[in-house]
Amino acid sequence: MKVAIYGQTYQDNAIEFLIQLLDELQKEAATVFIEADFYRLYLDSGADGEYPTFTPTAGLDDSFDMFVSFGGDGTILRATTFVKDLGIPIVGVN
């Protein structure tokens, strides 16, 4: 399974939930990419782990099985600008 993760976090617990998701995805041997700005927030929180990153213009393709969006409605709407015409399903975590 190949998963992209994106978030615009303004809540402290978003990184906590991200860490939980990463733990579960690791158990499934998933390949995980994290959006570059969200990854910086993850590292700035003191969390560790190396993950490849993506941006709005590079790093995503139609080989991804899922795009996880952390945030509210606006974040999911912005997530659509990442996946565009790639056909990647978006899963929202509010």
Which ranges hold each PLM region?
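Short amphipathic alpha-helical segments
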Residues: L18, G46, A79-V83
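Active-site regions of enzymes building and remodeling cell-envelope glycoconjugates
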Residues: S45-T57
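Small-residue-rich beta-alpha loop regions that form the catalytic core of phosphotransfer
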Residues: Q11-N13, R40, T55-N94
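A short, Lys/Arg-enriched amphipathic alpha-helix followed by its capping loop at the start of a domain
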Residues: Q20-A30
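Short internal beta-strands
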Residues: A30-D37
